[in-house]
Amino acid sequence: MLDVNFFDELRIGLATAEDIRQWSYGEVKKPETINYRTLKPEKDGLFCEKIFGPTRDWECYCGKYKRVRFKGIICERCGVEVTRAKVRRERMGHIELAAPVTHIWYFKGVPSRLGYLLDLAPKDLEKIIYFAAYVITSVDNEMRHNELSTLEAEMMVERKAVEDQRDADLEARAQKLEADLAELEAEGAKADARRKVRDSGEREMRQLRDRAQRELDRLEDIWSTFTKLAPKQLIVDENLYRELQDRYGEYFTGAMGAESIQKLIETFDIDAEAEILRDVIRNGKGQKKLRALKRLKVVAAFQQSGNSPMGMVLDAVPVIPPELRPLVQLDGGRFATSDLNDLYRRVINRNNRLKRLIDLGAPEIIVNNEKRMLQESVDALFDNGRRGRPVTGPGNRPLKSLSDLLKGKQGRFRQNLLGKRVDYSGRSVIVVGPQLKLHQCGLPKLMALELFKPFVMKRLVDLNHAQNIKSAKRMVERQRPQVWDVLEEVIAEHPVLLNRAPTLHRLGIQAFEPMLVEGKAIQLHPLVCEAFNADFDGDQMAVHLPLSAEAQAEARILMLSSNNILSPASGRPLAMPRLDMVTGLYYLTTEVEGDKGAYQPAVQDSPETGVYSSPAEAIMAADRGVLSVRAKIKVRLTQLRPPAEIEDELFGHNGWQPGDAWTAETTLGRVLFNELLPLGYAFVNKQMHKKVQAAIINDLAERYPMIVVAQTVDKLKDSGFYWATRSGVTVSMADVLVPPRKKEILDSYEERAEKVEKQFQRGALNHDERNEALVEIWKEATDEVGQALREHYPADNPIITIVDSGATGNFTQTRTLAGMKGLVTNPKGEFIPRPIKSSFREGLTVLEYFINTHGARKGLADTALRTADSGYLTRRLVDVSQDVIVREHDCQTERGIMVELAERQGDGTLIRDPYIETSAYARTLGADAVDEAGNVVVARGEDLGDPEIEACLAAGITQVKVRSVLTCTTGTGVCATCYGRSMATGKLVDIGEAVGIVAAQSIGEPGTQLTMRTFHQGGVGEDITGGLPRVQELFEARVPRGKAPIADVTGRVRLEDGERFYTIAIVPDDGGEEVVYDKLSKRQRLRVFKHEDGSERVLSDGDHVEVGQQLMEGSADPHEVLRVQGPREVQIHLVREVQEVYRAQGVSIHDKHIEVIVRQMLRRVTIIDSGATEFLPGSLIDRAEFEAENRRVVAESGEPAAGRPVLMGITKASLATDSWLSAASFQETTRVLTDAAINCRSDKLNGLKENVIIGKLIPAGTGINRYRNIAVQPTEEARVAAYTIPSYEDQYYSPDFGQATGAAVPLDDYGYSDYR
């Protein structure tokens, strides 16, 4: 067998009959499988041991040789080789066919490759192959030409003879008629009788004439067919063919069935044909040229690949190894078998019958019928159901053919090659583990024992608890007490991976240090739930064990949860306090006016109270019960840094040093909160809303090492839970208060609604107007009830606390609980004009309950659909971008894109761009950022973090040029500098990072949050597509619904307002021809945009428009943008449009992820003129390949090819990839494989998918070539200390925040310079 790590490419081609016979270990001659009495394989059958190898290790069929010592001997009695039984998984056989058959993939695929090669229509091809028509395979033109005159003379003689015969017959009949009539005359018969005789005589003469004419026509037909006879001509009329064969058999040959196709291919001159086709393409026009282009693709494929087209017609069929199509006995004595065995059996049966018929010399018609049946059975074996009705098994189920085994989700590619099951894994229910550190998880003892079994067994032997591995295994299985101690020792420092399905992004798998726990549930740290999207309502998680030292190192350094605090999509922290923790911290930092022990200033006779010399004193007071943590106090602080403005005021330019004292007016709770933050972090004197907490953690992530951030969020978690418990925030029915003003508010709106109803009944309003008015009224009513509710609730109400702290829920939900539900939609998505007036606290009436179910049901159905759609979108995105890997440090390009930092207002002030976080942030500057005076504020090549952006804004810079993957010039993949900072680590992206997959996950993961619907815009007929469908539409580069025209030129608008349509004409500024857009539906509305004077209004007559500007509401067609404005603009357009959808849902994704996908969509060029290159006109070529080939041609002073950029949807781009393995495992498997085989495609194994399929390490991360050859060798000391390492947590979370000594080096402090 090949070792998977030692080949560089994988080629697929057409197998000839010779290849098939070479692979084979013998011919399968009988359809039998096994003998049902002895259950042993039949000789020469489909499971024959002589062909495929023995069924039991080292044992021949007849039992003469049993034992490994006879290895390699071939038994002289039964002919079976003595070897391992596993060879039955790899040895193939073959069936020698009595007549050739065509391969259905090449004849029936779209387009039919055989048809294109031979220039035959698929319909004609089908007639030939299935014995419905003859085809002429060759004509001896010379001989025919030489003897044409003789043959013509013979034909004339024959025609003359027919005519003479006709004339003689007519003469004789006429005379007989005359005689008959004379006789009747003599007898004096009536005129009636005479007329009858005459009529019958004339009728007979007419028949004679017709018969002769038919014979003459037949001769004419035969002759004209013969004179025009040419190869590849079809003759459907069997009699005509027989006549031709009888008369002129020596001048031509013809046949039917696959044999005739085989003959045509044998005589086919590929080079000559290619030359003819190239000539047609150069000089032809229209349909002829198109057809020649399509044919040349197939012909050139055979010409260039050196494949023999004879492979499309088979003389032998390979039989796959028997273990891959097993026959197993079930418990009832019945057998279950793979469908392939049935299909092979049909082929063998028909083949044997055909051989017998040929030997017997059966009539041609019977033999042909048997050949047709053989062809059909081979078709069914290769691709059942592709032609005609599929062959069915018991219960009318179509049998699964070889093609079906590869196709689809259950096929070989997706089920077994890309989705393998893994050993050293387990799964269990998860429960919360609030006592864990961020990098720990609780692993049930029993599960850990099973997972680490080999390690435990080895260690038991090492420690002399067991004599050998076998007794160690017994000890483990019986769970002896010493096993647990050893287990504790073995799992120390050995990370495990936890995974929760669905794994929508890379944080769905993270590494943790296992802690042994009782019970059978895995304990999960509360802060990682956000990343896993886990909750504890019965979710399950899988555990995997990294085995090798390298795998453990990767798990520990790259995948440990405390190193994955930031989201790869937006670079913002995901490990944030949520729910209870937020409530706890919010409660802790709330200030309550006049609470127990609050600060009171000095009055005449009493001194001031609530003043403390240190936090310790305040805590003692709280413990004594004289001070509330939420009361305002004055306290002297020495270990907490004052806020910036106080620091400047008190400590001047030297700044605050630990130990310097200052007095803060704050609450004890806030002091306690600030003590959780790292030393030297400025004091935060605010109430901790969730957003404020997020901002703090964000800031920590920007400024401190990850290890500090991890420790801090862990402390916040502990504190949050502690204070949430102490706060006693719970929800009970008594907390849901209905506002007392609700009834009077509703009564007043009821009156207004009555008025509208009356107007409607009087006919003053039509139905739509009435509904609109009512919807408006009840929307107002709902808002007012909400307002009343807000005023009525006390500030310390638990529900309000939960909502206001940002822990969960929103005000709308509170209003639904206690106020009123308000308006709901019907199944069409329109508002029902009667609202739900009850709140859930009061209870709904039956009618209200019924109306409410519409929306609820639609929501559930929507969610289910959305999940499937979103998963499919992710799959396509991953497929198109999976080979985008960071390949080099810097591609040295000068190009970049301009991004906005701020907008300058009329009065000169700058308004910060709201989307700066996802556009400019975390990029590399492509050119110096210079202020108006010409000073460099940030130099080229610097990373734009928050401080740099602030510096630019302070210097009044409104836009900067940044590097982008859209302009990266790296051949395959991208360079680190163009990509910029990795969002997940906050550092420049590493070489080998699979940024394509990260991008696909970042876009696909929030897909389920996007809405499904297309929403109606206030009474406009045209739907505006939004949500998930819009994202799909953009990435698939489809023409959008409600497509809006864009200006092709810069110029003045002339607007004609028709009855139902607008007509817009643009008069170009450069005096060219005016561009007219007619039939623009009025329902779509004209576009509102900014005019030169800064005002915003609708497009009107005489306005000036720029090229590419949208003229109507709706979405521009990206293909139009590409045509009018070029590739750069369409890239920016796509990124902007995708971002709009995500922003509408409040999802933050960095532009760079979308750019990675968009770059893949614009990777190809379509060839317009091939020049001196090898490219075919109309073909799609990778841009890098196109440019390289053009450079080569120009260097040889030839004519370069001309091409234009083309925008491909992600599905099409995935299928057009250079890797046939990747494309075949994506979609349309048979089509991809057919194409690849004809072209003799070679897969260079550059992407990730191809390598996963063949089982190599993926060429990303540590699998990239430059790291591939680093082996991990433990040092002597490490070997000795292998099991004596102290626990991880001691050094990881030392109580003060100084870096502790010890074995663990935080990733941030680790220098990688020597590896690069």
UniProtKB/Swiss-Prot annotation:
EC number: 2.7.7.6
Binding site for Mg(2+): D535, D537, D539
Obligatory cofactor(s): Mg(2+); Zn(2+)
Catalysed reaction, written as an equation: RNA(n) + a ribonucleoside 5'-triphosphate = RNA(n+1) + diphosphate
GO aspect biological process, one term: DNA-templated transcription
GO molecular function, one term: zinc ion binding
UniProt-annotated binding residues for Zn(2+) 2: C891, C968, C975, C978
Keyword Ribosomal protein in record: no
GO annotation, cellular component aspect: DNA-directed RNA polymerase complex
Superkingdom to which the source organism belongs: Bacteria
Broadest EC class assigned to this enzyme: transferase
Family, similarity comment: Belongs to the RNA polymerase beta' chain family.
Subunit structure: The RNAP catalytic core consists of 2 alpha, 1 beta, 1 beta' and 1 omega subunit. When a sigma factor is associated with the core the holoenzyme is formed, which can initiate transcription.
Full protein name: DNA-directed RNA polymerase subunit beta'
Gene name linked to the record: rpoC
